[in-house]
């Protein structure tokens, strides 16, 4: 076959065939299909084409890489050339100004030598302008007058921009400002670039050529970024002034290029002049030679004073000190907070034993500005507006750097605000669904876990700042109040049963005890915050029991209970046993009869259930509320039995009522008194007095005197 050649020769021929200018893919495929013997030839040809494709791809990658490197080098050379051309242009401009000044000086000298010739030249130039005015038109004064004239058009900048001999206008022009997020036009501004700062002013709508002050940016903290053209947005550049940025649009590409070049050159000249000034100020100045004196004691005084003069010279020409402000800007921009604080510590250590001279004060002023910027960034890192994910450890970096900057109080305040927002968000995100007890379990787990983690992180971050712990205690109390609000809203405001409320409070107390592992006991706080709601719940449930007891008393027939089945009787025995009534068998009769009234049995079970649930809620502040509620409940039953005993005329029913009264006084009341003393830890005199009042009924059952 013509195309089935060796691997090497076939590959080179195939390459030449594909690279030829007259190559036609359709004709090539048609010819290939006609000359192939079968599928195998086509597969081999396909493999050769794939190998050629891979080889071509690798060659293309190598060429792209080589060209890319050449492109980078070319762009760098162009940038260098552009910078040199601009410097050359600047030098030529200065030379032109010098030559004009020299020419003007020579003309003035010639005019002095020949007044008649000077008068003729002045009249020819401008007959209305006196010669003395032209003599005052020196280069520096011209710049100063131009700056003053322009700034007179800007309202509100006279006090912010005091005139100084070295300040002059470099460049100015109109720009359009755009929103950085939506790229929408905001306003038209006029920018004044001076040799040490950039002034931005907005145009006044009703006054042509007049402006209002908007912002002033020192060149040291200003960065210029070219914005790539993206039609219709073009001819734009961005100014970065930490922590904000602004985007401006020039009238055309030429003006944009001029702005970029002039800004960079002015920044560079400013940095060089500042560096030279610091170097000159850092050089030790020779002490003035004192006049000779015949006093022999002055020599010793001079020898003692010489070292102090040497000590006043602080060497600020070190490279790392010169670059310190820029290095701090880089660290802040790159979020290298540790590196920035390390640089500040290094500077403070270097200047610790040095005298405070004027150059040191100026350096301190620059560094203090960066410290304020760094502090603002760290404060923003700890603000609740930031993401609250990651737990309290996510704030450790910013907190530790603020503490190193000597702002532990601010770090403590921001840390606690951040954690308060995190706890509040976590509680709000809990879904209220299912049983109340299930929600309370979730609520307690979320809140107390967050509180425990915050306490441990606080102890780690502020280990050496004992003064901050009082702030944490105040924060913990405030957080506990937020937790109790959510807890009470779900448990007490929704009118849950007393048993459910007791279980929920028990869960909260158990979680609160976990904080004692780190030495934080907030039990008294949760008691103080819950006491009002628990009092309301106890009184509400007491009223329910009293109403139910009165309703049963109104329907009382004083008949024995018939439980019908042994199972029901056994169940009642178990219920009474769980209530603490161990001698209940003496009140049971034959078959399934019970020698007690249904009303008295129901009252016993309800009262003991109330006491058990109330004891789960008990703490000392609730002592009198619980005791008074018990007395009120018992009095309702006691008064009813006493009244029925005095009013009943049937001897058989009267004996049955007396049997119920005996059960109430001799069995139920001692059980209530004993259980109350076990739960509270001390006896209740009111319950003892109530039980002793039953003696009156036992001594004189026919008396009409009430037990109350």
Curated annotation (Swiss-Prot):
Compositionally biased tracts (Acidic residues): 297-314
CDD domains linked to this entry: PH_RalBD_exo84
Domain PH: 168-268
Keyword Glycosyltransferase: no
Keyword list, A-Z: Cell projection, Cytoplasm, Exocytosis, Protein transport, Transport
Keyword match Cytoplasm: yes
InterPro entries: Cullin_repeat-like_dom_sf, Exo84, Exo84_C, Exo84_C_1, Exo84_C_2, PH-like_dom_sf, PH_domain
Reported function: Component of the exocyst complex involved in the docking of exocytic vesicles with fusion sites on the plasma membrane.
Assembly and oligomerization: The exocyst complex is composed of EXOC1, EXOC2, EXOC3, EXOC4, EXOC5, EXOC6, EXOC7 and EXOC8.
Entry protein name: Exocyst complex component 8
Source lineage: Eukaryota, Metazoa, Chordata, Craniata, Vertebrata
């Amino acid at each position: 076959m013509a195309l089935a050649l060796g691997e090497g020769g076939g590959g080179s021929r195939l390459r030449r065939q594909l690279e030829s200018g007259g190559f036609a893919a359709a004709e090539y495929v048609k010819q290939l299909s006609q000359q192939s013997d079968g599928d195998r030839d086509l597969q081999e040809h396909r493999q050769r084409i794939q190998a050629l494709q891979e080889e071509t791809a690798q060659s293309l990658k190598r060429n792209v890489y080589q060209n890319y490197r050449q492109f980078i080098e070319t762009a760098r050379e162009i940038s260098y050339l552009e910078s040199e051309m601009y410097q050359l242009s600047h030098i030529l401009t200065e030379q032109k100004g010098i030559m004009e000044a020299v020419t003007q000086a020579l003309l003035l000298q010639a005019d002095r030598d020949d007044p008649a010739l000077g008068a003729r030249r002045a009249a020819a130039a401008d007959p209305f302008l006196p010669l003395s005015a032209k003599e005052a038109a020196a280069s520096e004064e011209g710049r100063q007058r131009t700056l003053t004239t322009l700034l007179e058009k800007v309202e509100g900048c006279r006090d912010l921009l005091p005139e100084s001999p070295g300040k002059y206008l470099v460049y100015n022009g109109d720009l359009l400002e755009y929103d950085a997020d939506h790229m929408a036009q905001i306003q038209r501004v006029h920018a004044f670039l001076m040799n040490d700062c950039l002034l931005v002013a907005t145009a006044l709508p009703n006054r042509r050529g007049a402006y209002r002050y908007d912002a002033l940016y020192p060149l040291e903290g200003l960065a210029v970024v070219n914005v790539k053209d993206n039609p219709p947005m073009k001819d734009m550049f961005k100014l970065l002034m930490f922590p904000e940025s602004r985007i401006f649009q020039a009238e055309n590409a030429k003006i944009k290029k001029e702005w970029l070049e002039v800004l960079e050159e002015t920044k560079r000249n400013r940095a060089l002049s500042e560096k030279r000034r610091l170097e000159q100020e850092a050089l030790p100045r020779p002490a003035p030679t004192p006049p000779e004196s015949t006093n022999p004691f002055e020599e010793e005084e001079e020898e003692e004073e010489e070292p102090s003069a040497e000590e006043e010279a602080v060497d600020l020409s070190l490279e790392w000190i010169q670059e310190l402000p820029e290095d701090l800007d880089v660290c802040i921009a790159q979020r290298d907070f540790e590196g920035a604080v390390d640089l500040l510590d290094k500077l403070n250590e270097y200047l610790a034993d040095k005298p405070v001279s004027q150059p040191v004060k100026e350096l301190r002023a620059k560094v203090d500005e960066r410290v304020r910027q760094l502090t603002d960034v760290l404060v923003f890192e700890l603000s609740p507006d930031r993401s609250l994910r990651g737990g309290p450890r996510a704030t450790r970096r910013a907190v530790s750097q603020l503490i190193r900057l000597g702002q532990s109080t601010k770090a403590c305040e921001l840390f606690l605000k951040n954690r308060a927002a995190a706890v509040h968000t976590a509680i709000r995100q809990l879904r209220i669904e299912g049983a109340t007890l299930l929600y309370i379990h979730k609520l307690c787990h979320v809140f107390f876990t967050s509180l425990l983690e915050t306490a441990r992180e606080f102890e780690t971050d502020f280990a050496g700042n004992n003064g901050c712990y009082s702030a944490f205690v105040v924060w913990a109390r405030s957080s506990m109040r937020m937790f109790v609000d959510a807890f009470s809203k779900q448990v007490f405001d929704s009118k849950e049963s007393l048993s459910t409320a007791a279980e929920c409070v028990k869960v909260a107390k158990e979680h609160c005890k976990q904080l004692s592992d780190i030495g934080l006991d907030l039990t008294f706080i949760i008691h103080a915050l819950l006491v009002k709601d628990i009092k309301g719940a106890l009184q509400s449930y007491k009223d329910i029991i009293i109403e139910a007891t009165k309703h049963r008393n109104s329907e009382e027939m004083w008949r024995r209970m018939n439980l019908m089945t042994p199972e029901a009787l056994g169940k009642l025995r178990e219920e009474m046993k769980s209530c603490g009534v161990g001698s209940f068998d003496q009140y049971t009769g034959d078959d399934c009869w019970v020698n007690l009234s249904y009303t008295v049995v129901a009252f016993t079970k309800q009262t003991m259930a109330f006491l058990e649930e109330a004891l789960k809620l008990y703490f000392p502040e609730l002592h009198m509320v619980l005791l008074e509620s018990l007395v009120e409940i018992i009095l309702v039953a006691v008064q009813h039995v006493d009244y029925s005993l005095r009013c009943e005329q049937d001897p058989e029913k009267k004996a049955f009522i007396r049997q119920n009264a005996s059960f109430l006084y001799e069995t139920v009341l001692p059980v209530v008194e004993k259980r109350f003393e076990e739960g509270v830890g001390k006896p209740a005199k009111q319950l003892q007095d109530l039980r002793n009042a039953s003696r009156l009924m036992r001594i004189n059952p026919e008396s009409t005197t009430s037990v109350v």
